[in-house]
Design a protein with these regions (language model features):
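Actinobacteria-biased recognition of intrinsically disordered, low-complexity terminal regions
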Residues: 1-27, 224-250
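Hydrophobic, aromatic-enriched alpha-helical segments typical of multi-pass transmembrane helices
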Residues: 19-226
Length: 250
């Protein structure tokens, strides 16, 4: 494979490859951080916010009240990190099966998270304290937009899992194919299961499962790109050989 990674302004093939690799690794690292950051911040709020009950209240209601800015920031930062990871994922997987739509769908997941933070839900189900005990009869415009954010995020992530199943299977990465399929099925079952009983808990569990997949995939690509059928390792090897030829014998 002779394709060469290039970065505008680089003075030599070796420098170009090194710069591109650093940027790609930084983007992949965003995926590693996104999941643990979101889960830890959300969990701390679940345990500490007065009146919040995960068995009744979805995590998006944490965006309300005096401390709502914490969850808003959590949504937005985690979403932006997921979008950054999607850019890095495309650098690693493209070209090839799933190298276009896999990253795009992961990016859609990130966009859904950002939208969920920017457009907050209306007070409901008694949270924050003093809010109506039920669901408001009429939603605000931002609550209507917010209502589309979770489906966008979950659907994008679920489809991304199955898109990458095909890639991993084609590269005989059976473990990754099985893990991606299991993640997609679990997130679909938890988020689409009929009935409102336990919905907020199911969505929270689906969020943890989905973010775990993103973080584990990002970590694996950072440590061993070839393990997931990545062409990045081949490109880096080819660029290194080119740089060595350019330096000549020592």
């Amino acid at each position: 494979m002779t394709q060469e990674l290039t970065t505008p302004g680089a003075s030599a093939p070796g420098a170009s490859s090194e710069t591109t690799t650093r940027v790609t690794r930084a983007l992949l690292a965003c995926g590693v951080v996104a999941g643990p950051l979101y889960v830890v911040v959300a969990l701390l709020q679940v345990l500490s916010r007065d009146g919040f009950d995960l068995s009744r209240h979805p995590l998006s209601l944490l965006s309300l009240g005096d401390l709502g800015w914490i969850q808003i920031t959590n949504f937005v930062v985690a979403g932006l990190l997921a979008v950054a990871f999607a850019v890095g994922l495309r650098r690693v997987l493209h070209p090839g099966r799933g190298g276009t739509w896999g990253p795009r769908l992961v990016g859609g997941y990130g966009v859904g998270l950002v939208a969920g933070g920017v457009f907050v839900a209306d007070p409901a189900l008694g949270f924050p304290p003093g809010a109506p005990a039920g669901i408001p009869d009429q939603l605000s415009w931002h609550a209507v937009v917010h209502a589309f954010a979770p489906p966008l995020a979950f659907l994008s992530l679920i489809v991304a899992c199955f898109v990458l199943v095909r890639r991993f299977a084609a590269h005989r990465q059976r473990g990754w194919a099985a893990y991606s399929a299991a993640t997609g099925v679990a997130c679909l079952a938890l988020s689409a299961w009929p009935g409102q009983d336990g919905l907020s808990v199911r969505l929270a569990v689906a969020m943890v499962i989905g973010f775990a997949w993103v973080s584990v995939l990002a970590a694996r690509l950072l440590t061993d790109p070839a393990a997931t059928g990545s062409v990045h390792a081949e490109l880096q090897h080819a660029s290194t050989k080119t740089a060595r030829r350019g330096r000549g014998p020592t």
